[in-house]
UniProtKB/Swiss-Prot annotation:
Name this polypeptide is given: Kassinin
Positions bearing Methionine amide: M12
Expression sites (tissue/organ): Expressed by the skin glands.
GO cellular component: extracellular region
Organism: Kassina senegalensis (Senegal running frog)
InterPro entries: Tachy_Neuro_lke_CS
Function, in words: Tachykinins are active peptides which excite neurons, evoke behavioral responses, are potent vasodilators and secretagogues, and contract (directly or indirectly) many smooth muscles.
Subcellular location: Secreted
Gene Ontology biological process terms, A to Z: defense response; neuropeptide signaling pathway
PROSITE patterns from the UniProt entry: TACHYKININ
Keywords: Amidation, Amphibian defense peptide, Neuropeptide, Secreted
Keyword Secreted attached: yes
Length: 12
């Protein structure tokens, strides 16, 4: 599972 913050950076 990935943290929400890391997930947001991944789609940027």
């Amino acid at each position: 599972d990935v943290p929400k913050s890391d997930q947001f950076v991944g789609l940027m």
